[in-house]
């Protein structure tokens, strides 16, 4: 693994984060063409998974990416992962957390950083369909949930996946929550997240009246 060296003209995490999201080239070729598959969850809800399979062999490695807070298969990093997978002969899939695929989920729940049971259900189902190596990665919140699953599973995780990786995940949630609620982070990142989270919360309340206090 090579050490990351930021360009001299992008000092600091904020500039690197914002520039990558707004201006970086996501793929070396055309954007990925996803095939969507819908699963019924154990609680009667649904989950959408976006696949890129191309001309890969039946036993090709499968790279599973768990996206970050309010992310999706169209996030800049997801498209970059899809491009990497295609260039290395891998199949690729993004399982969307509840409510993140562009359609509101049905159950009176969303998703969270410690959602390891959801991660385990997804990976177990993919393992049952996959003959080749199964590789799992998570970005930010998705990495938190994946690492929680790996920690809960301990040695048994190796029976399901061949490798796991966490990218830019706020593993110390208390410190991360404190940091994102202050100064520049609050002004930029919190505002960005709330732009989609508030309408989703109100839509969920309309779907399930009385679920929480919408005036709080």
Protein language model features and the residues they cover:
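N-terminal presequences and immediately downstream first alpha-helices
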Residues: 1-26
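N-terminal cap/lid segment of alpha/beta-hydrolase-fold proteins
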Residues: 17-55
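Phosphate/oxyanion-binding active-site loops and adjacent basic polyanion-contact surfaces
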Residues: 45, 74, 112-116
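Short, well-ordered amphipathic alpha-helices
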Residues: 51, 120-124, 146-153
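Short, surface-exposed "cap/lid" segments of acyl-processing enzymes
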Residues: 53-106, 121, 125
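Alpha/beta-hydrolase-fold enzymes
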Residues: 130-216
